[in-house]
Swiss-Prot record:
It comes from the Eukaryota. Hetero-, homo- or pseudo-homodimer (identical sequence, different post-translational modifications). This is Alpha-conotoxin-like Mi20.3. The modification 4-hydroxyproline is found at P55.
Length: 92
């Protein structure tokens, strides 16, 4: 089998879901998982930790970026995530 045919065969077998439209590797995970968490893993969109609003309180306001609005979390080490079907929530 010539090299060109072999290369085409390999490219057809290679799963396209591993690559984005720009040619880079996609963040792996199941398609039913939290889409916002996968979005934040790409590039420089890292989630920021919760900031305590009231001194002495365990609750804070979680600010990710313009995608996710402010919300409350049970501890300062939590961060906002989005669960498909369940909406925004905190992961601690």
């Amino acid at each position: 089998m010539p090299k060109l045919e072999m290369m085409l065969l390999v490219l057809l077998i290679l799963p396209l879901s591993y690559f984005s439209a720009a040619g880079g590797q996609v963040v792996q995970g199941d398609w039913r998982g939290d889409g916002l968490a996968r979005y934040l893993q790409r590039g420089d969109r890292d989630a920021q930790g919760c900031q305590v609003v009231t001194p002495g309180s365990k609750w804070g306001r979680c600010c990710l970026n313009r995608v996710c609005g402010p919300m409350c979390c049970p501890a300062s080490h939590c961060y906002c995530i989005y669960h498909r079907g369940r909406g925004h929530g905190c992961s601690c």
